[in-house]
């Protein structure tokens, strides 16, 4: 038996000569849809003395991730060289698709594709495809929307662009997309649990941005329990909101900001409360506040009572495990007053006691 004419080709050659052209022929573009060598996990950090390095064996990297649009993933494609069967990469493709929360997995050795469709839209889980039978972006997106059960209104919100900024990690993508999708579908209480150091504030920013830009949520309140969290959030992750955003306070100091080049500047924050009259300027769309600043003294309580109970469409509570779900909590006063707003709780450690339950309040 003669060797396959592709047998001398490397996996990279197979991708370049057969898989990528098949994707492009089906309408997938490098600019919008295709990401090669997509890192899901960079690998564990191994420390030896003063030196450290990434353990490449624990790295997870998909050969291709296909997107409906930037940051809205649809499918994973795993490649193997021609010495392997067409479907040899499917176990990896399924693993990566599950991490990304997408239902479509493909495997290829350059001779064709094996397509695994977890939506079971036509009752078939896996099928073989020739190179020229790869689904178009529109076909996969239609299957995806039908699988999700989205109406056109929900689809509009779920497909709203991310704010231009750093590339989110795969777990941030999952948290952002699933939260936006849940709220678009009508869920009004969401508990978002992310480990310390995984970028909760950046994740919250992208959720708020997409809900705001889609028009689903027009007036938003972000609550935290420390001034530094509010101030640094305003000059860093929430910086793209500048002009539409203000601190719900009559006073603030200049905030130090270090940019990507290491340059230090002092920035003044826009304030929503008049220092003399304590009257709130309601012309802003994004408000950030310490919970103490709106539920402390009677004068401070009057600040949030200046808003009608239906003023805010969305409230995001940072570090909600600090007691926001307790019946006698200061934050709970705010959440109860603005009960008609969609409410998101952010935490690294959900609080579950006989008296306080973040899960009971926000849901799982």
Where does each model-flagged region fall?
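ATP-dependent helicase/translocase motor core
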Residues: 1-219, 224, 228-247, 256-259, ...
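Short beta-alpha junctions and helix-cap segments that line functional grooves
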Residues: 89-93, 207, 236, 274-275, ...
């Amino acid at each position: 038996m003669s060797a396959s004419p592709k047998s001398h080709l490397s996996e990279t050659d197979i991708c370049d000569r057969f898989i990528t052209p098949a994707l492009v022929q089906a309408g997938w573009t490098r600019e919008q849809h295709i990401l090669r060598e997509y890192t899901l996990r960079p690998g564990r950090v191994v420390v030896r003395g003063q030196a450290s390095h990434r353990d490449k064996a624990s790295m997870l990297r998909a050969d291709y991730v296909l997107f409906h649009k930037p940051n809205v993933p649809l499918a994973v494609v795993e490649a193997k060289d021609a010495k392997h069967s067409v479907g040899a990469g499917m176990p990896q493709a399924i693993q990566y698709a599950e991490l990304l929360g997408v239902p479509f997995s493909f495997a290829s050795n350059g001779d064709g594709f094996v397509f695994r469709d977890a939506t079971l839209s036509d009752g078939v889980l896996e099928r073989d495809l020739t190179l020229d039978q790869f689904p178009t972006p529109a076909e996969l997106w239609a299957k995806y929307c039908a699988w999700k059960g989205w109406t056109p209104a929900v689809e509009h919100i779920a497909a709203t662009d991310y704010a231009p900024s750093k590339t989110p990690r795969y777990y941030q993508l999952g948290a952002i997309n699933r939260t936006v999708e849940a709220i678009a579908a009508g869920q009004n209480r969401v508990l978002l649990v992310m480990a310390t150091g995984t970028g909760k504030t950046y994740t919250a920013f992208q959720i708020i941005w997409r809900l705001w830009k889609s028009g689903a949520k027009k007036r938003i309140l972000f609550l935290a329990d420390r001034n530094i969290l509010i101030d640094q959030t305003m000059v860093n992750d929430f910086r793209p909101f500048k002009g539409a955003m203000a601190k719900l306070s009559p006073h603030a100091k200049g905030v130090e900001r270090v940019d990507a080049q290491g340059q230090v500047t002092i920035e003044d924050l826009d304030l929503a409360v008049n220092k003399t009259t304590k009257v709130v300027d309601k012309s802003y769309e994004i408000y950030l506040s310490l919970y103490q600043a709106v539920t402390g003294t009677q004068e401070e309580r009057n600040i949030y009572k200046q808003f009608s109970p239906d003023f805010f469409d969305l409230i995001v509570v940072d570090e909600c495990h600090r007691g926001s779900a307790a019946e006698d909590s200061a934050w709970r006063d705010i959440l109860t007053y603005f009960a008609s707003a969609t409410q998101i709780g952010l935490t690294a450690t959900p609080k579950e006691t006989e008296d306080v339950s973040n899960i009971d309040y926000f849901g799982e």
